[in-house]
């Protein structure tokens, strides 16, 4: 099984990458062939033969997170060389071994810990009807998902990435930024296309 790990490390977040990749190498899906795709605005030296670096322009917040799916779409062909791909926030840590059977689903998302404490009507879906991330108050929702870890089969992930990138671009054309940036767009997508894991 081939897995592609996606990470964005701009500004100070570059300091977390080495430890994240160490954790992934030691504890994530043992036995799988893992390649990492790092999106960064830093000029960095080679960090291993299993890491591909994709340089991105330095942009002010929130662009690096808002446009993450746009970055992923640009590396579509590389990602599709793998069976699964997963996005990790650069400052994540893996404390225990994560087996492939625990995480390899068609489309994978992580419930947001803080948002899950609230009644569904108080979870912070984007309620702005001008945004393509819009979720009406009366729409049935199940879970609010965190943007820091998600993935799945590459075909499913790329399909999600293409839809989100297109919606982000259309919002930006209309001078709209979703409430929680890419996470708001991801939640809109996952309401219509629920994760399997």
Q: Can you say where each PLM-predicted feature lies in the sequence?
A:
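GT-A fold catalytic core of metal-dependent nucleotide-sugar glycosyltransferases
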Residues: 69-119
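Conserved glycosyltransferase catalytic-site signature
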Residues: 65, 69, 90-92, 179-184
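Short, hydrophobic beta-strand segments that form beta-sheet elements in well-ordered domains
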Residues: 33-41, 85-86, 91, 107-109, ...
């Amino acid at each position: 099984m081939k897995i592609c790990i996606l990470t964005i490390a701009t500004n100070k977040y570059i300091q977390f990458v080495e430890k994240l990749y160490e954790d992934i190498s030691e504890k994530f899906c043992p036995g799988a062939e893992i390649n990492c795709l790092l999106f960064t605005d830093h000029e960095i030296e080679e960090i291993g033969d299993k890491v591909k670096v994709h340089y991105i322009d330095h942009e002010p917040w929130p662009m690096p997170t808002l446009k993450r799916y746009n970055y992923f779409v640009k590396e579509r062909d590389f990602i599709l060389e793998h069976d699964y791909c997963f996005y990790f926030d650069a400052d994540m840590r893996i404390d225990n071994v994560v087996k492939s059977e625990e995480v390899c689903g068609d489309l994978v998302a992580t419930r947001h810990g803080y948002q899950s404490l609230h009644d569904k009507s108080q979870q912070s879906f984007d309620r702005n009807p001008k945004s393509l991330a819009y979720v009406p108050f009366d729409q049935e929702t199940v879970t609010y998902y965190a943007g820091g870890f998600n993935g799945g089969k590459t075909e499913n992930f790329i399909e999600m990435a293409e839809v989100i990138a297109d919606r982000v671009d259309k919002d930006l054309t209309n001078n709209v930024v979703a409430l929680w940036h890419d996470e708001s767009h991801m939640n809109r997508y996952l309401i219509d296309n629920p994760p399997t894991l």
